[in-house]
Swiss-Prot record:
The gene is DSTYK. Acts as a positive regulator of ERK phosphorylation downstream of fibroblast growth factor-receptor activation. Involved in the regulation of both caspase-dependent apoptosis and caspase-independent cell death. In the skin, it plays a predominant role in suppressing caspase-dependent apoptosis in response to UV stress in a range of dermal cell types. GO terms for molecular function: ATP binding; protein serine kinase activity; protein serine/threonine kinase activity; protein serine/threonine/tyrosine kinase activity; protein tyrosine kinase activity. Its EC number is 2.7.12.1. This is Dual serine/threonine and tyrosine protein kinase.
Length: 929
């Protein structure tokens, strides 16, 4: 349905008006920039969602393979549970928070639009015409505001001009419009309004969609809100914000807001947080002239005061809407018609606020998950290191415990015999009295003392024996227990804690190792039980009892009297052999001990096998975290962080080149992000691996708290058109200092200054180590000096947490510790590098040590370092300084001093040499000046 005779040609229109073509160009540039950065945000979000999906799939796949028994040689409940627990604990927590994902998805799905509100429909139409620079809508033919029925209007881009009715976001209505029936210069009023006699609900809700070949509409849709009487503004905004980001303009033509206007604005502020661009439209027919001669002071404007009262404006903001330094968008009031161009500034702030908030939210998700990855890498690395040591320690301590208990069993047999004799002597009278007074069970004893049958006599004798045996058992067991109690203090506490840590990832049902340990410890406690379970001790006692019975001779069955019971007990006690009893108890103790020891060893082997499988999985996961998961997420984090920085501070301007390194070029940058002056390092990663490494290193640098001994990193920007568009570069903007230590030593530095620099470097390295980072490239050119010659460490390009180091050989050959070539090293490599650096500091020059200067190639140098080549002692060196250097560059990392020891040593050297230097010539170090 094309309109005929329309005034627009084939080229996009940008006509005259208060803002002129310049305003439209600025608006187009601003909205085009928003679309461009929104596309990058959308791409980053899409890749982030894919990353989290991949993590979830990896987690589910690994858990499934664990439960189905795949991928393991020796598997059992312990291995399954441990492996599943490993994945569940270490991967399932990495997920996209639903709230943030929904928020970000809504932002990238919403395109911007300009929404025109106003005091009445005429002034809204007038503002639309000013924006487009052409007379599209009538501004004088519409009826009064009370009777106006202006429907919602949407202006979109199209190659041809079309006017149609359509339900918002749905379908076009088949309806004949007046615009279709002939030529027109402005859209006919009948097409703009809802007819009073129209009862078709769809027709009433429909919006008039106008497509035009216009430069501004190529970048953004423009929506004119319907009149208040047809639909409340709050409802219109509510529908719009689901699919669009509105840049709200409010057209004014009166000097004050009416009560109805204030109510409308109060409702908008109550339900929405969008800023509003208030623009006072010039009266029809008036000339647009420079308003400098008639500009009203802001504090005298009634509109300004009303908008302050409504909370839209602040008294600290200038009413003409000039751009401020605030990153958040603020409402503006423009009362001079020629300043409509400030709409481009306002829209830029609205769009930038939206993008910055989204980029910040996305980067927080990235950083949070990266920190989880790094923490997990530390946990996994510690697990890989400590678990084998715990297993070996457990085996060693249990063996010591076993041998100690076995020695007790062998050594104390004679003591046990004496203990049994002593116990019998002590308890004899008590046992005889108890036997005399005991009441028999299941035996009827005549009160007149008449004899009873042989069967009853045997039953009575047996009960007397049982009384003696049970009482003796209890006494012997208690004394035996006390003889091994001290072992609980010396062995059990540490061993049990070690076992608990080894078994905490296992199911409760498989805690058998600890059970066997308890059996070893409690062997003495089970003495009483074994007496009642058919052991050799019990059999021996019953043989003695039979002999007692045989020795008791009678012609006829005796009477059960007190004397008889005492006599039976006396015979039983006297016939017991203390030596045989002690031997039997010790033998039983050793048997139980051997059994528990063997069971413990077997159980520990099973536990070790379970941990072996788990550690294999842990190492695989650790490698995936270091090589894949963390670098991939770090690159997304770098992109979201750089997007945030470029939105806030724009792309930095490159100044003169300051230097070149292996991985980038350093430029001067006069001013960026409020920092002055700056240094800018441009890095062009040649491949995916370098991209990921750079991203991880940037995350470590950005995550570090500010420290006075480290060069500040201000931000980063990704330049997608670096080198004329031939490559993509990461621009790292950092603090600029006066010079590096290499240049400083060449120029000459005093002894006190040099020693203070050494202290500063140690302080900086200690801070890095406290954050879990290893620098790996401490050297002269990576120590920068300010104008006061205080040192700061820079170039954290090789800096990594210990748990994330892959063993790659990095650094500068002269400063590289020998173990770096093996791929297995820790933060002591920085101590080694400091030792070499301290040699230069003490020498006061940049001349190479002789041992290194003779090397013809890098490989030659590396081989010499591995064989123990070190810098020579110079005549100017103080003895304590030389000893400190030698200790720092010791070939054995374990023998190098901790930096917490080095720092006070350096301070002592500085106090001694510099104080003595002020009183007398220094005997140890020359003062280079």
């Amino acid at each position: 349905m094309e309109g005929d005779g329309v005034p627009w040609g084939s080229e996009p229109v940008s006509g005259p008006g208060p803002g002129g073509g310049g305003m439209i160009r600025e608006l187009c540039r601003g909205f085009g920039r928003y679309r461009r950065y929104l596309g990058r945000l959308r791409q980053n979000l899409r890749e982030t969602q894919k990353f989290f999906r991949d993590i979830k799939c990896s987690h589910n796949h690994t858990c499934l393979s664990s439960l189905t028994g795949g991928g393991g040689a020796e598997r059992g409940p312990a291995g399954d549970v441990a492996e599943t627990g490993l994945q569940a604990g270490q991967l399932s927590c990495i997920s996209f928070p639903p709230k943030e994902e929904k928020y970000l998805q809504q932002i990238v799905d919403c395109l911007p639009c300009i929404l025109i509100l106003g005091q009445d429909c005429n002034v809204k139409c007038q503002l639309l015409n000013l924006l487009l620079g052409v007379q599209v809508l009538p501004t004088t033919k519409l009826g009064s505001e009370e009777s106006c029925k202006l429907r919602r209007l949407r202006f979109t881009y199209g190659t041809q001009t079309r006017v149609s009715l359509a339900l918002p976001g749905q379908y076009e209505l088949v309806h004949t419009l007046v615009a279709h029936q002939g030529n027109w210069e402005t859209i006919p009023e009948e097409d703009l309004e809802v007819q009073e006699n129209n009862e078709d609900a769809a027709h009433v809700l429909a919006e008039l969609e106008v497509t035009m070949h216009h430069a501004l509409l190529q970048e953004v849709d423009v929506v004119v809100a319907p009149c208040q009487g047809l639909r409340p503004t709050v409802d219109v905004l509510g529908d719009l914000v689901n699919d669009f980001l509105p840049v709200i303009t409010y057209a004014l033509h009166k000097d004050e807001l009416s009560e109805r206007d204030e109510q409308e604005l109060q409702e908008i502020r109550k339900y929405f947080s969008f800023p509003v661009f208030f623009f006072k439209v010039p009266k029809l027919g008036s000339e647009i002239i420079d308003s400098s001669t008639r500009r009203m002071e802001s504090e005298r404007s009634p509109l300004y005061r009303q908008l302050i009262d409504l909370g839209y404006l602040s008294s600290s903001h200038w009413n003409c809407g000039a751009p401020g330094q605030d990153t958040k968008a603020q409402s503006m009031l423009v009362e001079q018609s020629e300043k409509l161009r400030h709409l481009s500034t306002f829209s830029h702030q609205v769009l930038q606020t939206r993008l910055v908030d989204a980029a910040k939210a996305l980067n927080l998700v990235h950083c949070h998950c990266l920190d989880i990855f790094i923490n997990q890498a530390f946990d996994m690395q510690r697990d890989l290191q400590i678990t084998p040591k715990r297993l070996e320690y457990t085996r060693k301590k249990e063996n010591e415990l076993y041998e100690s208990l076995m020695n007790i069993a062998n050594r104390k047999q004679e003591e046990m015999k004496d203990m049994i004799v002593e116990t019998l002597n002590t308890m004899k009278e008590e046992l005889l009295d108890d036997a005399t007074n005991m009441e028999f069970k299941d035996v009827i004893v005549p009160e007149n003392g008449e004899p009873v049958g042989t069967r009853e006599i045997k039953c009575c004798i047996r009960q007397i024996q049982e009384l003696i045996i049970s009482r003796l058992n209890q006494a012997v067991a208690n004394k035996l227990i006390s003889s091994v109690d001290y072992l609980r203090e010396s062995f059990v506490g540490t061993l049990e804690r070690c076992l608990q840590s080894l078994e905490k990832s296992q199911d409760v049902s498989v805690h058998i190792t600890s059970n066997y340990l308890k059996q070893i410890l409690n062997a003495a406690y089970h003495v009483e039980v074994t007496f009642h379970s058919g052991s050799s001790v019990t059999r021996m006692l019953w043989e003695q009892i039979k002999q007692i019975i045989q020795r008791i001779t009678w012609v006829s069955p005796p009477a059960i009297t007190l004397e008889w019971k005492r006599k039976v007990a006396q015979e039983a006690i006297e016939s017991l052999s203390a030596s045989k009893l002690a031997k039997s108890i010790c033998s039983q103790f050793r048997t139980r001990l051997n059994s528990s020891h063997e069971a413990f060893a077997a159980s520990l082997r099973q536990l070790e096998a379970g941990h072996s499988g788990r550690l294999e999985k842990t190492e695989d996961l650790w490698l995936r975290v270091r090589k894949d998961h963390a670098p991939r997420l770090a690159r997304l984090s770098l992109e979201s962080c750089s997007l945030q920085d470029v939105l806030l501070h724009r792309k930095p301007k490159l100044g003169q080149e300051l230097g070149r390194g292996q991985y980038g070029v350093v430029y001067l940058c006069d001013n960026w992000g409020g920092h002055f002056p700056c240094a800018l390092k441009s890095v062009v990663p040649p491949d995916e691996k370098h991209w990921n490494d750079l991203a991880l290193e940037f995350h470590y640098m950005r995550s570090l708290p500010k420290h006075e001994r480290l060069v500040d990193l201000h931000g980063s920007v990704i330049d997608y058109n670096y080198g004329g568009g031939s490559s993509i570069a990461v621009l790292l903007i950092m603090e600029r200092l006066h010079r590096d230590l290499y240049t400083g030593l060449k120029a000459g530095l005093t002894l006190e200054t040099r020693l203070q620099i050494a202290l500063d470097v140690v302080e900086g390295i200690r801070f890095l180590h406290s954050q879990g980072l290893v620098h790996r490239d401490i050297k002269l050119k990576n120590v920068l000096l300010d104008k006061q010659n205080r040192a700061k460490i820079t170039d954290l390009g090789f800096c990594k947490p210990e748990a994330m180091m892959s063993g790659s050989i990095v650094g500068t050959p002269i400063h590289m510790a020998p173990e770096l070539f093996t791929g297995k090293y820790d933060n002591s490599v920085d101590v080694y590098a400091f030792g070499i650096l301290f040699w230069y500091i003490c020498s006061g020059s940049v001349k190479l040590p002789e041992a290194f200067e003779r090397c013809a190639s890098k490989d030659h140098l590396w081989n010499n370092v591995r064989r123990g080549a070190r810098p020579e002692r110079l005549p100017v060196f103080d003895e304590e300084c030389w000893q400190l250097m030698e200790a720092c560059w010791d070939g054995d990392p374990l023998k190098r001093p901790l930096l917490g020891i080095v720092q006070p040593m350096l301070q002592g050297i500085m106090n001694r040499l510099c104080k003595s230097n002020s009183e007398q010539p220094n005997r140890g170090l020359d003062d280079s000046t």
